[in-house]
């Protein structure tokens, strides 16, 4: 099993944390508001601990469960405290009208995180194509991208421990397109599907 630290105390932190505890992983919760972190840790149970904001995380895998515009600044703020860790960015940088990405260049939040993280840190993009309520109700495919092979093995094993299927889409540059998939998911929720209780996945056909 894995040891993870959740930076953030919102809905996605709660959803991932719940599955992580159920999967037998060691979980730490960290938030700017210590009382919210304490409350989430107690709600998750399973020996979940509370960390100190900015301190070295307990988890080998650090999940930044934050709004997109806070991810890069927080990673920069943590600095060397994240050395040797695997950072998992789950954010979606949607624009204000939810019909485009907030950045115009062919980049991603995960790629920008890699620029400010310590050189010994690996960055993986994952979970951004899944709505919180889907994690609570179902077992969707989890697309992920990253450059470090061992980091992807570790993240894949963690995803599997949640009862989900990890699907590797390639190097970290693919994180840009995963963010685009997140946007497509929102478009489907508002149009073709018409509700939020679904997830994108892969169906394989033989013969």
Question: Residue ranges of each PLM-predicted region?
Answer:
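Active-site-lining helix/loop region of Rossmann-like oxidoreductase modules
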Residues: 141-207
């Amino acid at each position: 099993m894995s040891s993870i630290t959740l930076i953030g105390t919102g809905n996605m932190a709660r959803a991932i944390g719940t599955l992580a505890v159920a999967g037998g992983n060691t979980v730490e919760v960290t938030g700017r508001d210590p009382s919210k972190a304490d409350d989430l840790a107690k709600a998750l149970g399973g020996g979940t601990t509370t960390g100190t904001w900015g301190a070295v995380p307990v988890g080998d895998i650090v999940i930044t469960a934050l709004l997109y515009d806070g991810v890069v600044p927080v990673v920069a703020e943590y600095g060397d405290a994240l050395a040797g860790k695997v950072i998992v960015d789950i954010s979606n940088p949607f624009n204000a009208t939810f019909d485009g990405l907030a950045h115009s260049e062919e980049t991603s939040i995960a790629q920008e995180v890699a620029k400010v993280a310590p050189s010994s840190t690996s960055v993986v993009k994952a979970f951004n194509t899944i709505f919180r309520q889907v994690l609570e109700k179902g077992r969707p495919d989890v697309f992920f991208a990253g450059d470090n092979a061992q980091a992807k093995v570790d993240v894949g094993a963690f995803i599997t421990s949640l009862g989900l299927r990890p699907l590797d889409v390639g190097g970290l540059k693919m994180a840009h397109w995963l963010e685009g998939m997140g946007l497509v998911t929102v478009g489907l929720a508002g149009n073709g599907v018409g509700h939020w209780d679904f997830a994108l996945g892969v169906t394989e056909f033989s013969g």
